[in-house]
Amino acid sequence: MEINQPNLLEASKSCYSKITFFLLVISFAALVSTGFSSPELSLHHKICDQSVNKESCLAMISEVTGLNMADHRNLLKSFLEKTTPRIQKAFETANDASRRINNPQERTALLDCAELMDLSKERVVDSISILFHQNLTTRSHEDLHVWLSGVLTNHVTCLDGLEEGSTDYIKTLMESHLNELILRARTSLAIFVTLFPAKSNVIEPVTGNFPTWVTAGDRRLLQTLGKDIEPDIVVAKDGSGDYETLNEAVAAIPDNSKKRVIVLVRTGIYEENVDFGYQKKNVMLVGEGMDYTIITGSRNVVDGSTTFDSATVAAVGDGFIAQDICFQNTAGPEKYQAVALRIGADETVINRCRIDAYQDTLYPHNYRQFYRDRNITGTVDFIFGNAAVVFQNCNLIPRKQMKGQENTITAQGRTDPNQNTGTSIQNCEIFASADLEPVEDTFKSYLGRPWKEYSRTVVMESYISDVIDPAGWLEWDRDFALKTLFYGEYRNGGPGSGTSERVKWPGYHVITSPEVAEQFTVAELIQGGSWLGSTGVDYTAGLYA
């Protein structure tokens, strides 16, 4: 039976305010009962000065009052331990509600939320484990920051999915959980950046052409053609392999593999939606060429999917690699959001691939990702998400959109200034598709627009054709995020690269300092020095010049 009840609570902002007020009352009681000391108060204020909502941060952090404040690892660990059961409760609420809902899109949104809560809980548990077992090394410091940033992204994504088509009852059911979890995720990030500042040597050295997080074996694989790779599993439509479909192959991949599992997909068009779940780790999906091995689907928001669930291929198992494959969503521009590839796997490499769709083509959802030597086509927001992601040597190709639409290559989704996420486009080429080029004066295209308040995107050392409007960037909604975003351009070329007519927003920057540009390179934005080298993909750690 479809659930359709009147509003039980006020709208989201009202709910958010009530939670904050309630937490403040509790925190005041805690301070009185524990004899809150001046040093504790000072540290709490220092931490919460880093948060976008100081009052809610102070309320949250009062939970760990009385601990040895000098033991920074234990303070953050204790706070995260108190967060875990709350994430579990949100998971149970979403999962239980999904069983009682008849509306397919609402059910999908709730199942998305359940998956996202499960992923968040795993990351929080992993973070607690690091804090419990070891002093922070350069690598574990990087991991913690990336994972805690991803937890916040998961919570926001759940809320976004509910906004796409859920009833007020379903939104109300989940909002109280999600608003608190978002506040907690922001607070954990504030604790982290205050108590564990990045060390000056946080970027590990690069050996040879590869960051150290890419194993020697993976380096060899990424430099090898698919036909020359010795696979563990072969998928072939003609029956000559181990399986005829990708989904059969995914089911056969061992869970939580410590070694690389290679799945070779032979030439053919595979019409299926494929999900590499959290336990499908260290998978390498390799085809026989981006024009020969094609995985295609057509899920879309208009026909009842959520943006998150519309992906033709989704991967959330860490260490995912894809090479020599085309990922496609054929829904068309009239179907609006329709994702070809969604990645929520840490330390992902996408090499020599083609990714084709229209709106929301590629969804680098969260964590560290690297894309090299690939073609991506789309219309509106066709690279969107909140990963720490670098694109190198890629072709980014706006295509002909529907009348009344404007092409935007990026829509970056950073929601908190303490998240270490952002999109970097380096040494790429931006030009119109064959169908757009004759009419590009009629259909405008831009480098990006700010999806979320702290959106962060840099285009550097790239070729920009005249397909890009002289303004360069587009507003999302009037003056939303124009002061808090960070959009930058550095040493680009081509007829569309001139900056004299660019937007005059406070958050837009023409970068002249190499030191600033370096922050958006492989070595710094995605800590490539600690993991990319082992994958074998070619990359440039710093600036090209």
From Swiss-Prot:
The PMEI region may act as an autoinhibitory domain and prevent untimely PME activity during transport. Its main location: secreted. This is Pectinesterase/pectinesterase inhibitor. One of its GO terms (molecular function) is enzyme inhibitor activity. It comes from Ficus pumila var. awkeotsang. The active site is at D360 (proton donor), D381 (nucleophile). GO terms for biological process: cell wall modification; pectin catabolic process. The keyword Flavoprotein does not apply. SMART domains: PMEI. Its EC number is 3.1.1.11. The record marks Q359 as: Transition state stabilizer. Acts in the modification of cell walls via demethylesterification of cell wall pectin. It catalyses: [(1->4)-alpha-D-galacturonosyl methyl ester](n) + n H2O = [(1->4)-alpha-D-galacturonosyl](n) + n methanol + n H(+). Residues 38-191 are annotated as: Pectinesterase inhibitor. It comes from the Eukaryota. One of its GO terms (cellular component) is extracellular region.
